[in-house]
Amino acid sequence: MKDLVDTTEMYLRTIYELEEEGIVPLRARIAERLEQSGPTVSQTVARMERDGLVHVSPDRSLEMTPEGRALAIAVMRKHRLAERLLTDIIGLDIHKVHDEACRWEHVMSDEVERRLVEVLDDVTRSPFGNPIPGLADIGLDQDREPDSGIRAIDLPHGESLRVRIVQLNEILQVDQEQFSILSSAGIRIGTEVDIINEQGRVVITHNGMMVELMDDLAHAVRVEKVDGLN
């Protein structure tokens, strides 16, 4: 039974991630993210639709029901709070944080979650700059939602810009090779870099080191101009 619950939570969290990244949630995208077969994904989505968690639209995109979205937000909140704990207090290697938090999100109790909100210094964003959602649901008031910047692939084409890295979405954290390249170049949340959005790729330069991201990963980088991005 627990395996079924975990599978449901993983699917809902993946749909939530895709929405955050500006990607249409399709069963094919879930199959890619979770490395599962098409038939397996279709069967699981059909079960989730029967359970009232998602709805398959005529264009085949997946829409979470209010119940499904509430569960997705709860799972993502626990995931990102776990990331903060693992980084800020335990001091786990940043390259291991995402995978470890994926385990914690399914077993963290509501009591522990509320306690984390009390002991952590920053519960607005994960260590990767991603907003921690649904804090009001556990009694934490926020004046406003944190800004999320703009996707690197949505920057003007061919123009060199000075920007600050504000967010690295989940798909980039999972790609250990590319994430390590960024880390080795000193590119992390809060780093100021020079960036050019070219056709099909984004080039980021920091301290003389140049990192190239193709669009399938560059969409997961969000930035803001050092002097503000409109």
From Swiss-Prot:
Q: Which GO terms describe its cellular component?
A: cytoplasm
Q: How does it assemble?
A: Homodimer.
**MF annotations from Gene Ontology:** DNA binding; DNA-binding transcription factor activity; protein dimerization activity; transition metal ion binding
Which Pfam families does the annotation name? DtxR (PF18357), Fe_dep_repr_C (PF02742), Fe_dep_repress (PF01325)
Protein name in UniProt:
Diphtheria toxin repressor
Q: Provide the GO biological process annotations.
A: negative regulation of DNA-templated transcription
Its annotated compartments are: Cytoplasm
Keywords of this protein's UniProt record, alphabetized?
Cytoplasm, DNA-binding, Iron, Repressor, Transcription, Transcription regulation
Signal peptide region: none
Q: What is the source species?
A: Corynebacterium efficiens (strain DSM 44549 / YS-314 / AJ 12310 / JCM 11189 / NBRC 100395)
The record, for Gene3D superfamilies, names: 2.30.30.90, Iron dependent repressor, metal binding and dimerisation domain, Winged helix-like DNA-binding domain superfamily/Winged helix DNA-binding domain
Residue ranges occupied by any HTH dtxR-type domain in the UniProt entry:
4-65
Q: Which gene encodes it?
A: dtxR
Which family is this protein grouped under? Answer: Belongs to the DtxR/MntR family.
Q: What does this protein do?
A: Iron-binding repressor of the dipheteria toxin gene expression. May serve as a global regulator of gene expression. Represses ripA under iron excess.
